[in-house]
Amino acid sequence: MNLVVLLILTLLLFIVSYVVDAGQVILVDSNITRSFVDMEADFSPSVTTVETGVVYVAEPLNACRNLRNKPEQSPYGTSPLVLIIRGGCSFEYKVRNAQRSGFKAAIVYDNVDRNFLSAMGGDSDGIKIQAVFVMKRAGEMLKKYAGSEEMEVMLVPPNTEDSVWSLYASIALILSLAIFCVMVTCVFFYRYCSTIRNSTSQFNGMCRRTVKAMPSVTFTCAKIDNTTGFSCAICLEDYIVGDKLRVLPCSHKFHVACVDSWLISWRTFCPVCKRDARTTADEPLATESTPFLSSSIATSSLVCIDSPPLGSSVSFSPAHVSSSFIHQFVRSSPMNGSRISENLRRQASPLQSSSQRSHLSMKSSHSLGYSTMSPLNAMGMSPYRPYPSNASPGLFSSTNHLLSNYTANTFSHFASAHSLPD
């Protein structure tokens, strides 16, 4: 890409030099007028005014030797011009031969048909006549009308005003191209930096320091070392006595270089069992029954105790109630653990003293024929869990006070101190 830009800039500079130095050779006759673009020689005086004269063909045509023809003095006071073809010798030598022969200006035309003009270079020491270069078709046209005094040739200097505007336009074009190249370069650089940044952000390996901190052993025998096998599962090379093996938390072993490269540059799990190498060795493996969330992030909803079917007679001690129901609620709501423990201690003695009264109350409730289902069941919601028959009213009143945010609408007027649901 840089080479293409350099070539374009060179071409533009060449066009600028062509536009600035380009003049005109005009062929004027009573019937025709032809204009041709020319380029002044670097070593000859510049054409500052319009030069008018009759053109003559050089003999020899390439003017590499002294010219045999001499210019004739025109009665109209015009200057004699000589027409020379390119090739055979240098431009400077041609112009010097034309100057020695007495011509006032030399017109050199190309010997090959091209679409551009070539600059004529040489030593300007002693050169006093003007010299211009034209294309091949212009030289052939001038050669056709050479020697005719009725056909005049005019050398017109470059238009200074047009040249300045052309120079400004060329400079603007070059600046626009340069800005475009800079923008393209910035875009490519931005994409390159984005690619590097994305590849860095998508790094999936482990820290080198963490990998190096993993334990390693020296291989002695596969059976003694309890290794994965007799060969490394990464490079498939057999273990040799004395090889350093890296031990992952899953107890699989690999060559140190192999598994270090795997963990640092590629993935963070064991290549064999896919266990995460960032875990500790005593951490239990994840199974299909492993919950997605740990117990510390468990839901804060009330955990109910499974009870036997309705109608069965089961006795629960206060200690059993406190160690099951309250313990499960504390696990589901860690924020209220200390508060529940304090209230539980306060209710320890009332529970023991009111055990018998609770038993009698349960019997009386059966004799009165109250329904064994709570109003919550009657509303079509979650099933009501029956409470133990020997539990005291104090336990339920305390629990109802502690769990007011969860069970405010659970108990009805049946859950009183003297009538509890079965």
UniProtKB/Swiss-Prot annotation:
GO BP, one annotated term: protein transport
- Tell me what topology the record assigns in the membrane: Single-pass type I membrane protein
Q: Name the job this protein performs.
A: Involved in the trafficking of vacuolar proteins. May function as a sorting receptor for protein trafficking to the protein storage vacuole (PSV).
Protein name per its UniProtKB record: Receptor homology region, transmembrane domain- and RING domain-containing protein 3
Q: Which UniProt keywords apply?
A: Disulfide bond, Glycoprotein, Membrane, Metal-binding, Protein transport, Signal, Transmembrane, Transmembrane helix, Transport, Vacuole, Zinc, Zinc-finger
Q: Give the ZnF (RING-type) ranges.
A: 232-274
Which segments show compositional bias classed as Polar residues?
349-368
Q: Which SMART domains match?
A: RING (SM00184)
Matches recorded under PANTHER family: RING ZINC FINGER DOMAIN SUPERFAMILY PROTEIN-RELATED (PTHR47168), RING-TYPE DOMAIN-CONTAINING PROTEIN (PTHR47168:SF5)
Q: What is its main location?
A: membrane
